[in-house]
């Protein structure tokens, strides 16, 4: 015959309740810990580990080939931007950056992807100084870049005398004016890291191309299994961000094509996120 035994109700309050809760969580985690994490679990042989790694690689490659629209987190870019802008309302403009992150699937030992993106709409304003004694190039540069410092020997003399302050971020020059820069303003530009040099790639006869690439260029490099790069600010228009995303896609694919490997990396799922917003999957194919 079964008998009913009354169990006294224990009420735990205050710090003890919190400790009890965390202790229960720990016990639950210990009881249901996967066998592979247990100290008594047998270690895998080299062949077993290799097969497991190969299986995971096949799974990641299969996932990379799935269309972005299959993800429950997918949104068209314009709709995703609306949500991300909403998440940044009230934040300082300096923190309202739209980031693009692309997962990279590759075999072990494959070199990480790297390169640079030239954005149609740069994320920040960069002031540039260009030095050349070629009058035709000076005229061309002054017409194309009126808001930047463009000049020859006269500009070098003004920097040397302190008439013009060194408030620019980058400097470029043609080979004909490099000796004057080295002899007159190297001690001024060098410590600030803006002295043009062949080693840095800031000296060229085609100075116009250097300026064009530098004004909107942003380097990227694969970290771990992903590439992350800023593609805009929340106050950019949808069109400006879309153009920057297209440029990033072209640069990523160029980096993949330039890989010297029989089995190059594959670009997988891509998400858009903001500084304080969620990650939203977009179509990056």
Swiss-Prot record:
Q: InterPro entries from the xrefs?
A: Ribosomal_uL1, Ribosomal_uL1-like, Ribosomal_uL1/biogenesis, Ribosomal_uL1_3-a/b-sand, Ribosomal_uL1_CS, Ribosomal_uL1_mit
What residue stretch is labeled transit peptide in the record? Answer: 1-19
Question: A Gene Ontology molecular-function term?
Answer: structural constituent of ribosome
Give the source's domain of life in one word.
Eukaryota
Q: Which UniProt keywords apply?
A: Mitochondrion, Ribonucleoprotein, Ribosomal protein, Transit peptide
Q: Which Gene Ontology BP terms does the record give?
A: mitochondrial translation
GO (cellular component) term, any one: mitochondrial inner membrane
Where is this protein localized, as stated in its record?
A: Mitochondrion
- UniProt cross-references to Pfam families, sorted A to Z: Ribosomal_L1 (PF00687)
Cite the record's note on assembly: Component of the mitochondrial large ribosomal subunit (mt-LSU). Mature yeast 74S mitochondrial ribosomes consist of a small (37S) and a large (54S) subunit. The 37S small subunit contains a 15S ribosomal RNA (15S mt-rRNA) and 34 different proteins. The 54S large subunit contains a 21S rRNA (21S mt-rRNA) and 46 different proteins.
What PANTHER family does UniProt report for this protein, alphabetically? 54S RIBOSOMAL PROTEIN L1, MITOCHONDRIAL (PTHR36427), LARGE RIBOSOMAL SUBUNIT PROTEIN UL1M (PTHR36427:SF3)
NCBIfam families, sorted: rplA_mito
User: Per its database record, what is this protein's job?
Assistant: Component of the mitochondrial ribosome (mitoribosome), a dedicated translation machinery responsible for the synthesis of mitochondrial genome-encoded proteins, including at least some of the essential transmembrane subunits of the mitochondrial respiratory chain. The mitoribosomes are attached to the mitochondrial inner membrane and translation products are cotranslationally integrated into the membrane.
Give the free-text miscellaneous remark of the entry: Present with 7000 molecules/cell in log phase SD medium.
Name the family.
Answer: Belongs to the universal ribosomal protein uL1 family.
Q: What is this protein called?
A: Large ribosomal subunit protein uL1m
Which source organism does the UniProt entry give?
A: Saccharomyces cerevisiae (strain ATCC 204508 / S288c)
The lineage, from the top, is: Eukaryota, Fungi, Dikarya, Ascomycota, Saccharomycotina
Protein encoded by which gene? MRPL1
